[in-house]
Amino acid sequence: MKKITNNVTIWIKPKTVEKKWYLIDAADRVLGKVAVDVVRILRGKHKAYYTPHQDLGDNVIIINASKVRLTGKKHQQKLYYRHSRYPGGLYSDTFKTLSERKPCAPLEIAIKGMLPKGPLGRDLFRNLKVFSGSEHTLKAQNPIKLEANLREVK
């Protein structure tokens, strides 16, 4: 008869994980598809030891956020709402006006909406750096450039 042993589940601690930096060019890519790929990397779902309640994901740098595109007529019809917290203080912007005022905001809003709500989501969002132009200030991190098919990240 075999001796029965207790199997122990090993939990990876966030401090022991070495975070990589990825560079994504958002020029001429659909807003939602870029956001889905970025959130997957931020959460760490591309890793074998993914755990939903820990920050085991990597850091992401997005360039050319102002050149992201939308399908259909969403450029004029998509609305973004914000409130001043005063009575009657609801404001709305279209994608076009918001991207003229803050070029990185539509992509950041889409990514933030896909992350978990709460302290973990706020920590994950801090791992994201978005730049409207083609230059970024994080060259010292030696980011790995990802091409169009981001679902193949290992």
UniProtKB/Swiss-Prot annotation:
CC per GO annotation: cytosolic large ribosomal subunit
Gene Ontology terms describing biological process: negative regulation of translation; translation
Gene3D superfamilies named in the record: Ribosomal protein L13
Entry-linked Pfam families: Ribosomal_L13
GO molecular function: mRNA binding; structural constituent of ribosome
CDD domains: Ribosomal_L13 (cd00392)
Keywords in alphabetical order: Ribonucleoprotein, Ribosomal protein
PROSITE patterns registered for this protein in UniProt: RIBOSOMAL_L13 (PS00783)
InterPro entries assigned to the protein according to its UniProt record, in alphabetical order: Ribosomal_uL13, Ribosomal_uL13_bac-type, Ribosomal_uL13_CS, Ribosomal_uL13_sf
NCBIfam families: rplM_bact
Record's subunit section: Part of the 50S ribosomal subunit.
Record-stated family: Belongs to the universal ribosomal protein uL13 family.
Functional note: This protein is one of the early assembly proteins of the 50S ribosomal subunit, although it is not seen to bind rRNA by itself. It is important during the early stages of 50S assembly.
Protein name: Large ribosomal subunit protein uL13
Organism, scientific name: Borrelia garinii subsp. bavariensis (strain ATCC BAA-2496 / DSM 23469 / PBi)
